[in-house]
Amino acid sequence: MLNPITKKFQLGKHTVTLETGAIARQASAAVMASMDDTCVLVSVVGKKEAKPGQDFFPLTVNYQERAYAAGKIPGSFFKREGRPSEEETLIARLIDRPIRPLFPEGFTNEVQVIITVVSVNPEIAPDIISLIGTSAALAISGLPFSGPVGAARVGYTDGQYILNPLQSELPTSQLDLVVSGTDSAVLMVESEADVLSEEVMLGAVVYGHEQMQVAVSAIKEFKAEVNTPSWDWVAPVKNAELLAKIAELSEAQVNEAYQITEKAVRYEKIKEIRSSVLEALLAENADVDVQEAKDLFHDLEKTVVRGRITDGNPRIDGRDPESIRALDVMTGVLPRTHGSAVFTRGETQALVTATLGTQRDAQRLDTLMGDKTDPFMLHYNFPPYCVGETGFVGSPKRREIGHGRLAKRGMLAVMPSLEEFPYAVRVVSEITESNGSSSMASVCGTSLALMDAGVPIKASVAGIAMGLVKEGEKFVVLSDILGDEDHLGDMDFKVAGTTGGITALQMDIKIEGITQEIMQIALNQAKAARTHILSVMDEAIGGHRDDISEFAPRIHTMKVSQDKIRDIIGKGGATIRQLTEETGTTIEIEDDGTVKIAATSGEQAEDAINRIKALTAEIEVGTLYTGKVVRIVDFGAFVNVLPGKDGLVHISQISEERVNNVSEVLTEGQEVKVKVLEVDRQGRVRLSIKEAMEKPAAEATPAAE
């Protein structure tokens, strides 16, 4: 007999239901979570024993959408779901980021969270309820998880914040922000914005955190009701004696090493110091646990770097907390691409290209929330050579997909509409060097490459990554963090925007206790850094090029009557196929009669435009045309006056003199001048050669080829 435990609560305009005990009972914990009609099944399984020698926390979050949730059958050949889509990967990362820091240090047992979307209301995206459901499942699992966390989406319209806006409300919202955190702290923010001020963005984070508290409280009550026994896991005690010995042997050397500005040289020096420490420890005691010693040496590195920063000493590369690394900007670096740029900030570098295409090149997405067409694509590649390593090269990893989407979020607010710029645009950011903040270098490089390609973006966009080191009440906010400062610090806070405001904000916090004051300082510091970077970028290229690349397709737009669309397409698409082949263009026709012609030369475009005009032209009564005889019959001849439009010259209208046999006067293929006498209601055209001959001075309109 199933005895489910259920908890219901109101989150804004939506009813949230959490239920356990009925489905997936062999998992460590399972929760069916629903927000109105959008339902997800969340399962958590944790292994009771860690693998021997494992020195990291193997947490896996799998988010999977099922087509049946939206009443669909998958469109693939196999008619079943395949590898995760980009959207599924991004939501898996969104869930992973706030829960990972809530597991204790030293916990290395394998944990897998699987979120399956089983029902979806197209108005309610599954990401927020997936995060809430994951938090609830972890809370009742007995795992050492210091949650629960809540989650909320925040919109901003007409100066008002909106809690969990519907999908139909988002297009008119100036903000799409997801925030997650505990009852006392914000842990994760992911957002895109329409150039909003720092105050509005911070207000949205605070508002979302306040509103999600109802979810945090409900999950705590749910946990108390389920009352799962906690695991008897005890955090491993650090060997203080061994740590002291390592510090005695190497603290001064580590301190010196972290003043070497070049990353590769610094890493080599640290490696040497670590090897000599291990050698000394083993010489003194052959039974020393080498892995434990390596972990403690890493702890010493962390203590040294953080201590230097909080004590007011220069950072690893000699900068003060607010300084930006040296910048170098180049545009138009690749001869045949439509737009290109190299953006270098210290030891982080991005080679970014922009490619223009027609609407046929836009990405078509078949998602649970409906079919979409995306004319702007941004792809981020992080090859192993950019950090001086060898490694596997293949399809993009989760991190690359996430960084690409963040850079795209930063650019969306400044992209022109399709009416202003009817092109599909693909940007690719190749990270050629990396020492922190490569996603923000991609934002800067994308802005430069788009301007180089002649894309009329509304403003230049720059991105900056901020960090934080907090020890007790002392804290230091760092601008433009290095990879080591990201790894050893307490916060990764990325801000992209224009001189007018913020377009994207991403925040990941590893500790509790980040106050509103700290976030405000970080935002203000980021604004100053962003303004500086934008000034350097504007020196290199102050605005978009006046014209697109000679190698890019040129799109010409014209309008035809909707009832003429079939004339351009022809039977089975024959006419449009012939048009594209003979003119060397790409032609797209929309339902409203808009015709877009993409050509690499003006001559090709003009040829296609003239042919389309001829195909869609109306035959006018009283007008003279030069046409070709296409068929001879006993009672007259059919003459083609416009493409696809023939008219009849009756035998009585061929000549002033009596004609007994049409073939004696006319032959097929013969060019003749005709005058339009009548176009009847059925579209039948009556022509006259005789009438045309009466006015030899009048110039005939030539028939289009």
UniProtKB/Swiss-Prot annotation:
EC number: 2.7.7.8
Residues involved in Mg(2+) binding: D486, D492
Record protein name field: Polyribonucleotide nucleotidyltransferase
GO molecular function terms attached to this record: 3'-5'-RNA exonuclease activity; magnesium ion binding; polyribonucleotide nucleotidyltransferase activity; RNA binding
Keywords attached to this entry: Cytoplasm, Magnesium, Metal-binding, Nucleotidyltransferase, RNA-binding, Transferase
Cofactor or coenzyme needed: Mg(2+)
Signal peptide positions (record): none
Keyword Membrane: no
SUPFAM superfamilies (UniProt xref): Eukaryotic type KH-domain (KH-domain type I), Nucleic acid-binding proteins, Ribonuclease PH domain 2-like, Ribosomal protein S5 domain 2-like
Main location: cytoplasm
CDD domains: KH-I_PNPase, RNase_PH_PNPase_1, RNase_PH_PNPase_2, S1_PNPase
Catalysed reactions listed for this entry: RNA(n+1) + phosphate = RNA(n) + a ribonucleoside 5'-diphosphate
Quaternary structure note: Component of the RNA degradosome, which is a multiprotein complex involved in RNA processing and mRNA degradation.
Keyword Nucleotidyltransferase carried by entry: yes
Domain KH, chain residue ranges per copy: 553-612
A single GO BP: RNA processing
Similarity comment: Belongs to the polyribonucleotide nucleotidyltransferase family.
SMART domains for the chain: KH (SM00322), S1 (SM00316)
Domain S1 motif: 622-690
Any one Gene Ontology cellular component term annotated for this protein: cytosol
Encoding gene, per UniProt annotation: pnp
Taxonomic placement: Bacteria, Pseudomonadati, Pseudomonadota, Gammaproteobacteria, Alteromonadales
Function: Involved in mRNA degradation. Catalyzes the phosphorolysis of single-stranded polyribonucleotides processively in the 3'- to 5'-direction.
Protein's cellular compartments: Cytoplasm
